[in-house]
Amino acid sequence: MNNINLKVLLPVLLFLVCLSISYVFIMDVETPLPEIVSQPGEKDELVYFGVISRYSPRSIVSGYQPLMEYLSENTPYNFKLKLSRNYLETVDQLAMGRIDFASLGNYTYIQAHNKYGIRCIAMPINAEGSIENYDDIIVSTHSEIQSLKDLNGKSFAFASKQSFSSWMGIWMLKEAGVELSDLSRYENLSYHDLVAEKVLRGDFDAGMVKAVVAESFKASGIRVLARSPAIPSVPLVVASHVDSTRKRVVQNALLRLNELIAAGIVDTEGWDTEVANGFRPGHDSLYNF
C-alpha cells in the first residue's frame, strides 16, 4: 500500500526499542494550556477530542478547533478539544475515559494500541490523496552543513521524547555513521515548531521535525538536509470505552470530509495541514512495525 516501506521501518522500530532502554531524554517542558471555549449549541452530549502536544498549545487550538466545529456540525455530538502537556498524557486521557477520540503519533499509537486496545479509525491524507508522511532533518539555509556526516561535532534538536520523529532522527543519524555521542550536544524540545524556531535562530545546528513543519518554515530560512523513508500519516483513534454507534458516526463524518472539500461545501483553509485534506479509513496493519 503506497510506498511505505515496512522493511525499512521494522529495523527502525527494533532499533528504537533497544535504544529506549539506555537513552536518557530531557523531559518535556510543562506548558500552561490555553482555555478552550466551547460554542453554545443545542447538543448536550459532549465528546472530548485530544491531540498530542506535537505543536504549541496555541498552534493546536488554531489548527484543530475547526475540525471540532466540523464534527459538531456533522454528528449528533458537541465536540470539545482537550489538550495535554505531553504525548503520554493524551494516551492516559484515552485510557481513563477522559477523552473519546484523539490524534496520536505513530510511536504513541503503537504503545496505546498494545496496552489499552485503542484503535485507529481514520488516517489523514495529503494534498495528493496519499497517507504517506515524512520527517525531515533541517538546517538553516545559511548553514555550511551539506550532509548528515557533517553533523559530527554539531548540536542537534529533537522534538518530544515520545515523538516518532525523534526516534527516526536518531536512526537516520546512526545510519549515516553519526552517534549521539558524536554530537556536541543534543536536546529534546517540547514541540516540532520549537525545534524549527531554534534551528532558525542558531541555537542548534540542525534538528528533526515533521515534514509539514519543515515546509512551513522554508520561507523563513529553513533547509531540508535529509528526509526519512515514507511512514504512515498520524492516526486518529478511538478509545476502547466508546460504543460502536458513536465510533461509526464519527468515523463516517471524518471519511466524508474529503468529498465535502472536493465539492466546495467545506473550506479547510486555516486548518492544521495534516487534517486539511480529509481522511482515509484507518489500517492498524500499517502500524505493525
Language-model features: locations:
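Glycine/small-residue-rich loop that forms an oxyanion/phosphate-binding "nest" at active or ligand-binding sites
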Residues: 111-129, 133-139
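Short helices/loops that flank or line small-molecule/ion binding pockets
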Residues: 88-102, 115-116, 149-152, 191-204
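Bilobed "Venus flytrap"/periplasmic-binding protein-like clamshell domains
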Residues: 44-72, 84, 107, 131-197, ...
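Generic structural signal for residues in well-ordered beta-strands
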Residues: 79-81, 186, 224
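A ligand-binding cleft/hinge motif common to bilobed small-molecule-binding domains
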Residues: 103-116, 175, 197-226
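N-terminal hydrophobic or amphipathic helices and topogenic motifs
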Residues: 1-89, 264-289
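Periplasmic-binding protein-like
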Residues: 48-54, 127-136, 218-258, 269-289
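Sec-exported extracytoplasmic/periplasmic mature domains
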Residues: 72-76, 95-99, 114, 174-178, ...
